[in-house]
């Protein structure tokens, strides 16, 4: 199991580098595909569609695609309109097929657009910032890096449960280790890339601060995804990534972290 997780993790890192470094259309298409797969996993878990692919799911996917097109065409001022249009599409399916769908399915369909597609899109938006190729790294340090540090510290000295009912294996000590580890990794990252990233303000201290805040947010994202799985009585969202589960199982913390790293980078750097 560990070997499978490790190999899958290496493949994910290679894919991340191969899409983030060139950015542009390569990253856009990759994120759009990941978002749609993640939405499908969430819709299945939340029973938006009982069997097959129905109108409600298609409305959610269409809304996500329209939102992503505003980013591709560099028309970010229309992104809010795109999100509202997604809501109109979903509500249209609801009213014109009534009583096929229930209100909770409608809310889940719209939740999928925002929770998965919109929030993941901030990886692309961060990449498009000045020095964005380097800033995207902070998203993954704050999520995957923090998670690894939290796991190691928790295994070594974890005693006090962070969320005993929801996630019994997570400890307060592990959480602290995750935040501290992310801050340290962020600082080291700044030192390593300074030769290629001379932008003012991109100091080790700032990167450490951003990664520490991002790590705190990533814990919420991780636990939130776990809470949904517990509510729906499923172990994983999917089986796409061997040893990890589905897209949402691997990107649960990234989903929450990406928007905050984007805004922190805009404010602090």
Residue ranges and their predicted role:
Residues 2-212:
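Membrane-embedded alpha-helical bundles of polytopic integral membrane proteins
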Residues 144-155, 218-230:
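Short helical (or helix-break) motifs at transmembrane helix termini and adjacent helical loops
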Residues 155-156, 227-233, 255, 259-260:
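Re-entrant/interfacial helical elements at transmembrane boundaries that shape
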Residues 167, 171, 246, 259:
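Residue-level recognition of oxygen-bearing side chains
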Residues 212-220, 247-255:
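Hydrophobic transmembrane alpha-helical segments of multi-pass transport and channel proteins
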Residues 230-253:
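Interfacial loop-to-transmembrane junctions
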Residues 262-269:
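Juxtamembrane boundary at the C-terminal end of a transmembrane helix
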């Amino acid at each position: 199991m560990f070997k499978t997780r490790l190999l899958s993790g290496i493949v994910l890192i290679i894919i991340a580098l191969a899409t983030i470094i060139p950015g542009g259309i390569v990253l856009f298409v990759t994120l759009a595909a990941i978002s749609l797969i993640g939405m499908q996993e969430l819709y299945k878990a939340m029973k938006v569609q009982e069997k097959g692919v129905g109108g409600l799911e298609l409305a959610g996917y269409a809304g996500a695609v329209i939102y992503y097109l505003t980013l591709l065409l560099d028309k970010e001022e229309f992104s809010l309109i795109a999100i509202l249009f997604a809501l109109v599409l979903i509500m249209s399916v609801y009213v014109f097929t009534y009583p096929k769908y229930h209100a909770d399915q409608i809310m889940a369909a719209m939740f999928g657009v925002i929770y998965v597609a919109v929030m993941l899109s901030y990886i692309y938006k961060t990449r498009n910032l000045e020095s964005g190729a380097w800033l995207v790294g902070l998203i993954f340090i704050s999520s995957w890096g923090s998670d690894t540090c939290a796991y190691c510290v928790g295994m070594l000295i974890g005693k006090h449960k962070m969320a005993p009912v929801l996630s019994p294996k997570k400890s307060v000590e592990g959480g602290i280790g995750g935040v501290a580890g992310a801050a340290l990794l962020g600082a080291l990252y700044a030192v390593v890339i300074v030769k290629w990233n001379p932008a003012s303000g991109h100091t080790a201290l700032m990167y450490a601060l951003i990664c520490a805040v991002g790590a705190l947010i990533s814990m919420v994202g991780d636990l939130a995804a776990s809470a949904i799985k517990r509510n729906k009585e499923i172990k994983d969202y999917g089986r796409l990534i061997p040893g990890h589960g589905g897209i949402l199982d691997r990107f649960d913390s990234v989903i929450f972290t990406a928007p905050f790293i984007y805004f922190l980078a805009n404010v602090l750097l």
